[in-house]
UniProtKB/Swiss-Prot annotation:
Family annotation (InterPro entries): GTP_cyclohydrolase_FolE2, GTP_cyclohydrolase_FolE2/MptA
Protein family: Belongs to the GTP cyclohydrolase IV family.
Pathway annotation: Cofactor biosynthesis; 7,8-dihydroneopterin triphosphate biosynthesis; 7,8-dihydroneopterin triphosphate from GTP: step 1/1
Pfam families assigned to the protein according to its UniProt record, in alphabetical order: GCHY-1 (PF02649)
Name of the featured protein: GTP cyclohydrolase FolE2 2
Keyword presence, Coiled coil: no
Enzyme Commission number(s): 3.5.4.16
Keyword presence, Hydrolase: yes
Organism this protein belongs to: Burkholderia lata (strain ATCC 17760 / DSM 23089 / LMG 22485 / NCIMB 9086 / R18194 / 383)
GO terms for MF: GTP cyclohydrolase I activity
């Protein structure tokens, strides 16, 4: 077995000068799976698994970044994730990598315990959540994105049919830039309350009757859905800007209906 000479200094190739003089806007690690815990609206802690993307800006004269430091950052941050801890984590990454700009993004399944509307039976429903932060020239922006599955029912189908109406599962995706702390549950509630009906993991027959009739009494086109959710986001001071999408997986077509609204509330409409 070869023994390393204790006097030998391993070269740091990444820190050498690059003569091509081309800056790299984003360089780092992608799709790193790592356990994390998140704080819920009620103050409980929920264990989950995050898929992380971490990157920084690399100056034109620097050959490479220090890839191991990204993973080391995850190992050092095992405390339950909050918006403030996430902000501090972003600042720590820039310090460790000696970078002027960088971005962290983590996507994870988030579970909410829901109570069925009639029977009261409880079950979990999962939502896809992404927390992202980017820092540049001392300015830090944080984003909270959640994909909410809901039910939509077609107003036209209801109007022209003697009975019944076609309905389907839909996805409402809210990507909000935060002006203040905003619980994941708050965005979930907005999407579910503005849909024809929300979803549950477990329903009994009386519950199925309720959700069927609830959707029938609250029909919405995909245009109605995004506009109603947008009104709620416009009224929420915790949201500075947003990209809002709705996709209906049409039950009578082999394609989806889709709508998008994008707004920065800091700018005049």
């Amino acid at each position: 077995m070869n023994q390393m000479n204790p006097a030998f200094v391993m070269p740091d190739v990444q820190s050498t000068v690059d003569t091509r003089q081309i800056p790299i806007q984003r360089v780092g690690v992608k799709a790193v799976r790592h356990p994390l815990t998140v704080c819920t609206e009620s103050g409980d802690v929920q264990p989950t698994v995050g898929v992380w993307n971490l990157d920084v800006r690399l100056p034109a004269d620097q050959k490479g970044t220090h890839m191991s430091r990204f993973v080391a950052l995850l190992e050092e941050n095992r405390a339950p994730l909050t918006v403030e801890r996430f902000r501090a984590m972003l600042a720590s990454m820039l310090e460790k990598l000696e970078a002027e700009a960088g971005r962290i993004e983590v996507t994870f399944p988030y579970f909410v315990n829901k109570t069925a509307p009639v029977s009261g039976v409880q079950s979990l429903l999962d939502y896809e959540v992404t927390l992202a932060g980017e820092s540049r020239n001392g300015d830090t922006r944080l984003f909270l994105k959640v994909l909410v599955p809901v039910t939509s029912l077609c107003p036209c189908s209801k109007k022209i049919s003697q009975y019944g109406a076609h309905n389907q599962r839909s996805h409402v995706t809210i990507d909000a830039e935060l002006a203040a702390d905003l619980p994941v549950e708050a965005l979930i509630r907005i999407a579910e309350e503005e849909a024809s009906c929300e979803l549950w993991g477990l329903l009994k027959r009386p519950d199925e009757k309720f959700v069927t009739e609830r959707a029938y009494e609250n029909p919405k086109f995909v245009e109605d859905l995004v506009r109603d959710v947008a009104q709620r986001l416009d009224a929420d001071e915790r949201v500075a800007a947003y990209v809002l999408e709705a996709e209906n997986f049409e039950s009578i077509h082999n394609h989806s209906a889709y709508a998008l609204i994008e707004r920065d509330k800091r700018q005049a409409a």
